[in-house]
Each structure stands twice: as C-alpha cells, then as structure tokens.
Amino acid sequence: MKALVILGLLFLSVAVQGKVFERCELARTLKKLGLDDYKGVSLANWLCLSKWESGYNTKATNYNPGSESTDYGIFQINSKWWCNDGKTPNAVDGCHVSCSALMENDIEKAVACAKHIVSEQGITAWVAWKSHCRVHDVSSYVEGCKL
C-alpha cells in the first residue's frame, strides 16, 4: 500500500511538472512542426526564445500583475492577447485556444499559436527574444542536433 502511495505521488509530480524538453529533442520537434524558417525565423531563434521564456518547460507559467494576465507554456503565450484561461479580464483570445492546451506535452497547439503570433507581430512579440536572442549568435542552440 505504501508503495502505491509513493508511486501515485511520483506520477502526480510528473504531471504537474510537465515535459522539459532536451534542446535537440525540441529542435527536432519544432522542425517537424514547421517552425524552421517560418516567417523567416530560424530554428535556432525559436530554441533561444524557448530557452529564455520557459527553460523548454511545457508547464511554465508566469503571472503578470500589471495586466492581470498569465504567460503559458513553452513559448510563454499571454492570456491577455492569445489564449483563454477564463480569468484574465478583457482577454482577446487571438489564437482561439485554451491556455491549458498550450501547456500540453504535445506542443502542436502551442506551435500553431506561436505561428499565428509571429505572422501578426513578428518574433519581436517575445520580450525574451529581444533581450537574449536578437543581437546574439544563436547557432549554438541547434549545434550538434543532427537535423
């Protein structure tokens, strides 16, 4: 019985933590989902953005008290403009997706929303990209990934 309780707690902690991608695993996944050079944004830039936004963690969240909104998932997509979390005042839901869907281990919906965002606003919509990736050599993010 004690072993079942411990096993249950282990599974619960994995479910709450979500998937933290390895760098090259994420590179292959993003490439497969069509982000490599999407709207002129290189795969290395998407990896840099993901690293600085979420640490490659699908369950990452960040509350923004000023706008009463939350950033969700591997790309930290904001509930004020892009997804519906049911609690952000005057939310737009530009991607027509629930914010919880952006935190799934299968990142297909997060990628679809990221494509929508970059199509409308460009990669500069992400503050972390502007701060950590824009003027840097990001080639190391895909180095050795055998793409």
Curated annotation (Swiss-Prot):
GO BP term, pick one: defense response to Gram-negative bacterium
Active site (catalytic residues): E53, D71
C-type lysozyme domain sequence ranges: 19-147
EC numbers for this chain: 3.2.1.17
Matches recorded under InterPro entries: Glyco_hydro_22, Glyco_hydro_22_CS, Glyco_hydro_22_lys, Lysozyme-like_dom_sf
First-tier enzyme category under EC: hydrolase
Subcellular location, principal: secreted
Tissue distribution of the protein: Expressed in stomach.
Signal sequence extent: 1-18
Keyword field: Antimicrobial, Bacteriolytic enzyme, Digestion, Disulfide bond, Glycosidase, Hydrolase, Secreted, Signal
Keyword Repeat tagged: no
Similarity-based family: Belongs to the glycosyl hydrolase 22 family.
Protein role: Lysozymes have primarily a bacteriolytic function; those in tissues and body fluids are associated with the monocyte-macrophage system and enhance the activity of immunoagents.
Other comment: Lysozyme C is capable of both hydrolysis and transglycosylation; it also shows a slight esterase activity. It acts rapidly on both peptide-substituted and unsubstituted peptidoglycan, and slowly on chitin oligosaccharides.
Subunit structure: Monomer.
Official protein name in the record: Lysozyme C-3
Protein source organism: Ovis aries (Sheep)
